[in-house]
């Protein structure tokens, strides 16, 4: 049943126990729980029997109940600060009554930062730990401490999760909330980085609107609603004198213009909604100007369609 090493160990234990015992049998002083033969051992022992064999060479003397009696009143209940412990660690009477009364008799002269938020100073003259929960002048924990208990607390973990969630919804660019006295907010649509210093949240500016005829306009939204008029604006007389090829070219220019305008307004409205810095009235104002641009574009396209 047992391997060779286990059987050799058991035989050695039996040999020593047999030599210590008397010739007539086991002595009363030997703390054996079972009787085992000295030679010819072939019994099927249980784990409890192996434990009893081990007690032959390693007897255990239990302690008396009064030896375990411990009272908090017999020991000092004051926890020294780190600095005071380093200064007095060579003193054999560190926790004596005289040292405690000399160091902590006047708690007003003690600097709270000296304790690092990790120990309590008791007002009780008995200096017992039983009053620590009601007599502490400073809390046991300090804000920002990196102890394992603080870092693993549910409150700390939940705070980290809340911060991470808020960062996902806060805008990453530097946007300033303008007052109601300003013009409606503007957002860039092309070629402007979100980290630009001169960025305003809402501004409709496209490359095809930088023509000199619209550069003097005070409102970029107004210029966006007014398409370039170099080739697209034509009088009815000019349209009648055009041939079919010129009319088709004019229609192509109008189509390209309205597509660029619609893309610019669509990007502006989408970014106004996603950023969260624009009110509903500001978004509605940009959308109305988008509809006005469509209406003006249709008025320009209508004469060309009649002539085709």
UniProtKB/Swiss-Prot annotation:
Residue spans of biased composition, Polar residues class: 138-148, 205-229
UniProt key word Cytoplasm: yes
Renumbered residue ranges of the record's region Disordered: 138-157, 205-235
Assigned keywords, A-Z: Cytoplasm
Region forming the signal peptide: none
Subcellular compartments: Cytoplasm
Species of origin: Schizosaccharomyces pombe (strain 972 / ATCC 24843)
Keyword Cytoplasm applies: yes
Predominant place of localization: cytoplasm
Protein name: Uncharacterized protein P4H10.14c
Domain of life where this protein originates: Eukaryota
GO cellular component, one term: cytosol
């Amino acid at each position: 049943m047992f391997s060779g090493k286990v059987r050799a160990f058991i035989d050695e234990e039996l040999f020593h126990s047999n030599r210590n015992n008397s010739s007539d049998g086991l002595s009363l002083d030997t703390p054996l729980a079972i009787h085992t033969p000295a030679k010819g051992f072939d019994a099927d022992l249980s784990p409890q029997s192996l434990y009893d064999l081990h007690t032959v060479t390693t007897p255990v003397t239990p302690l008396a109940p009064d030896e375990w009696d411990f009272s908090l009143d017999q020991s000092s209940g004051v926890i020294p600060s780190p600095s005071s412990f380093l200064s007095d660690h060579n003193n054999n009477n560190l926790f004596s009554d005289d040292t405690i009364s000399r160091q902590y008799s006047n708690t007003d002269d003690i600097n709270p930062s000296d304790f690092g938020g990790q120990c309590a100073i008791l007002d009780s003259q008995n200096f017992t730990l039983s009053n620590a929960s009601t007599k502490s002048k400073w809390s046991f924990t300090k804000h920002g401490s990196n102890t394992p208990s603080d870092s693993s607390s549910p409150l700390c973990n939940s705070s980290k999760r809340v911060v991470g969630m808020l960062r996902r919804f806060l805008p990453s660019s530097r946007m300033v909330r303008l007052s109601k006295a300003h013009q409606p907010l503007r957002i860039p649509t092309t070629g402007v980085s979100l980290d630009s210093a001169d960025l305003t949240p809402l501004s409709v500016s496209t490359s095809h609107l930088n023509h000199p005829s619209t550069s003097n306009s005070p409102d970029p939204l107004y210029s966006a609603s007014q398409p370039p008029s170099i080739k697209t604006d034509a009088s009815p007389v000019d349209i009648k004198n055009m041939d079919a090829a010129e009319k088709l070219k004019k229609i192509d220019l109008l189509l390209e213009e309205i597509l660029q305008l619609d893309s610019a307004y669509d990007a502006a409205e989408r970014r106004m909604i996603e950023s969260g810095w624009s009110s509903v009235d500001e978004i509605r104002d940009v959308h109305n100007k988008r509809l006005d641009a469509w209406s003006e574009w249709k008025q320009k396209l209508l004469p060309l369609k009649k002539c085709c």
